[in-house]
Regions:
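N-terminal non-cleavable signal-anchor helices
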Residues: 32, 147-148
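Nucleotide-sugar donor-binding patch of glycosyltransferase catalytic domains
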Residues: 44-45, 76-147
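Donor-binding and catalytic core of enzymes assembling or modifying cell-surface/extracellular glycoconjugates
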Residues: 1-88
Length: 148
């Protein structure tokens, strides 16, 4: 299982839990649909909702898990806790979600980070240690802290 699938497997097994998947491109939507069919309590919203509908759904969530991406900022707009995963970029570069707790960022401190301002460059180390070092257990632990 991929890291994302390991996190979904763990979280979706909880009673009284609903996990909503948000996404964009055609390849991503296909994967999210497959995950929604495979894991219990998982619903893919990718490509199905307007932005206003997404914001309304997010406003009722206990937490949002995101990469450094647009959904982090949307969740921040509706003032819900966001657990954000950072790889090549860094929240100190000014891209953190509005009014979000720095304690809810998951990142590996490496001297090569940030390797680019907006994450568009390839890893010069060739190992993507900034993301590979983040484990499903780290993510689940952060989510548990937020929702407990």
């Amino acid at each position: 299982l991929s890291k994302q699938e390991q996190i979904l497997k763990h979280l979706s097994a909880r009673d009284h839990t609903k996990i909503f998947l948000f996404g964009g491109g055609k390849k991503e939507i296909k994967v999210l649909e497959e995950w929604a069919q495979h894991f219990p309590n998982v619903i893919s919203t990718a490509g199905k909702l307007t932005i206003n509908m997404e914001l309304a759904l997010m406003s009722n969530m206990d937490v949002m898990l995101v990469m450094d991406a647009a959904n982090m900022h949307l969740a921040s707009l509706v003032n819900i806790p966001v657990v954000s995963i950072w790889g090549a970029t860094h929240p100190c570069a000014g891209f953190a979600g509005w009014n979000q707790s720095a304690a809810n960022t998951i990142q590996i401190d490496l001297p090569c980070r940030p390797c680019s301002l907006s994450g568009e460059k390839h890893c010069y180390r060739k190992d993507y240690a900034c993301l590979q070092g983040i484990t499903p257990e780290m993510v689940i632990e952060h989510i548990n802290k937020v929702i407990s």
